[in-house]
Design a protein with these regions (language model features):
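Short glycine/serine/threonine-rich phosphate/pyrophosphate-binding segments
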Residues: 75-84, 89-91, 157, 178-182, ...
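Alpha/propeptide regions of enzymes that mature by internal proteolysis
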Residues: 5-16, 21, 25, 31-34, ...
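Oxyanion/phosphate-interacting regions
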Residues: 183-235
Length: 235
């Protein structure tokens, strides 16, 4: 997938780049010895031609002895960044035992992520200021030296305002909070905070766990219809 869309960097057409990644990832599964089920994918069956939620893939379709897994995929995260040759586009695949990945609906998720040192020290149950001061204390930094990555969206304005009142170094990103969370875990930043996409949140959780970091997510509904859909999916 990465090679396929990488050849289209700078092409100016994000849909073309995304389509190349999707087709390459889907084709690759034909030769992988698993029975995979898409938990997080390109959308509902009626909205995505392949890698749709619930699609079953892999050589395990014809061989019941092969392991059954759930997968969360984003064949090309930050499609526009690839199309215009900007940083932080990635191809993502998370694999877990069958039944262990959250089938997150198309809604928002409030997220917080950071390095392993912050285990049990940061939480969505705390206020933004409490998380900032806790992280600063554990990481032995002045609050003003903390770098916090936040998606630049209206829904995050109150968090951004609070951090700027504390003189935190706030890095606003236009897209790509999966990479943002990985940067926070790896030390290029100190925290990722804010509301983003729920399906990407599941992938982020898997990535952060693999990097031995800290992640917490909570579904966030800005409209009742999204909550109704989530309740239907998660029953």
């Amino acid at each position: 997938a990465a090679i396929a869309c990488g050849k289209l960097r700078g092409c100016g057409d994000k849909n073309k780049a995304d389509d190349a990644a999707v087709k390459a990832m889907r084709k690759a599964f034909d030769s992988i010895p698993v029975h995979a089920r898409v938990a997080i994918g390109e959308g509902e069956m009626d909205k995505a031609p392949m890698l749709y939620i619930g699609e079953e893939l892999g050589k395990g379709l014809l061989d019941s002895s092969l392991p059954q897994v759930d997968i969360a995929v984003d064949p090309l995260e930050c499609t526009s960044h690839c199309a215009f040759d900007l940083p932080n586009s990635i191809c993502v695949l998370a694999v877990a035992p069958r039944g262990t990945l959250l089938h997150a609906p198309e809604c928002y998720m409030d997220k917080i992520a950071g390095p392993s040192a912050l285990m049990n020290k940061i939480s969505l149950g705390l206020s933004v200021e409490e998380n900032i001061r806790s992280a600063a204390a554990i990481l032995k930094k002045p609050v003003q030296e903390l770098k916090v990555i936040v998606l630049d969206r209206p829904r995050n304005e109150s968090k951004i305002r609070t951090m700027r009142q504390l003189d935190v170094n706030v890095e606003l990103i236009q897209n790509g909070d999966i990479v943002g969370a990985m940067r926070a875990v790896n030390g290029d930043a100190d925290l990722l905070l804010g509301i983003g996409s729920a399906p990407e949140g599941v992938i982020t959780a898997a990535a952060v766990k693999g990097l031995n970091g800290v992640f917490e997510g909570k579904l966030y509904f800005h409209e009742q219809s999204y909550q109704d859909r989530a309740e239907e999916i998660l029953q």
